[in-house]
Design a protein with these regions (language model features):
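A short, Lys/Arg-rich alpha-helix, primarily the initiator
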Residues: 1-20
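Short, charged recognition helix plus adjacent turn
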Residues: 69-106
Length: 106
């Protein structure tokens, strides 16, 4: 059976924050304007949190939005490369890092 948890880093983070604040999934689903089953899948890493939800989460939990966005993007990179062989994953990440460093905004 294929593992459907591809957005796990961000999902774990939002679950940990929710539990630390003693909130229920229902409350978060309402805040993010989604239903509870979808929110549950986000925490499990089976569904991706939408980008527009990140500022709401940062405000609710009083955390740095940039840090949440970084984690969210890292999950996207991981999801894109997850099915590739390990050496190819690492080479692709290294090449992308080089490209970002060399990019002059053109």
């Amino acid at each position: 059976m294929k593992d459907k948890r591809i957005y796990g880093m961000f999902g774990h983070k939002i679950k940990d924050m929710r539990l630390e604040h003693g909130l229920r999934q229902r409350h978060l689903a309402e805040l993010l304007e989604t239903d509870m089953p979808m929110y549950s899948k986000m925490e499990l890493g089976a569904r991706r949190v939408r980008r527009d939800m990140i500022p709401k989460l940062a405000e609710l939990y009083k955390v740095n939005e940039h840090e949440l966005m970084t984690l969210w993007l890292a999950d996207a990179v991981f999801a894109a490369l997850k099915s590739e062989e390990k050496s190819l994953q690492l080479d692709a990440v290294d090449l992308a890092k080089e490209h970002f460093k060399a990019d002059k905004g053109l």
